[in-house]
Curated annotation (Swiss-Prot):
PROSITE patterns: 4FE4S_FER_1, 4FE4S_FER_2. [4Fe-4S] cluster 1 binds at residues 10, 13, 16, 55. This is Ferredoxin-like protein in nif region. Keywords: 4Fe-4S, Electron transport, Iron, Iron-sulfur, Metal-binding, Nitrogen fixation, Plasmid, Repeat, Transport. The lineage of its organism: Bacteria, Pseudomonadati, Pseudomonadota, Alphaproteobacteria, Hyphomicrobiales. Its cofactor is [4Fe-4S] cluster. Residues 2-30 form the 4Fe-4S ferredoxin-type domain. [4Fe-4S] cluster 2 binds at residues 20, 39, 42, 51. One of its GO terms (molecular function) is metal ion binding. It comes from Rhizobium meliloti (strain 1021). GO terms for biological process: nitrogen fixation. Binds 2 [4Fe-4S] clusters.
Length: 64
């Protein structure tokens, strides 16, 4: 399962885009989105999801 970004809570700071090791986070239109075909929840390389760990707003990057 991939992660998603709750657009209404996102501050559009861009931290998640630069932190994602798989390049799954991109700015599309007016918001950041996570490509579910690229997101693997950082399994195999990290103890936590990198997008969620750098997000300044709790519960903005969540399981889809």
């Amino acid at each position: 399962m991939a992660f998603k970004i709750i657009a209404s809570q996102c501050t559009q700071c861009g931290a998640c885009e630069f932190e994602c090791p798989r390049g799954a986070v991109n700015f599309k239109g007016e918001k950041y989105v996570i490509d579910p075909t690229k997101c693997n929840e950082c399994k195999g390389g990290f103890d936590t999801q990198q997008c969620a760990s750098v997000c300044p707003v709790s519960n903005t990057c969540v399981p889809a």
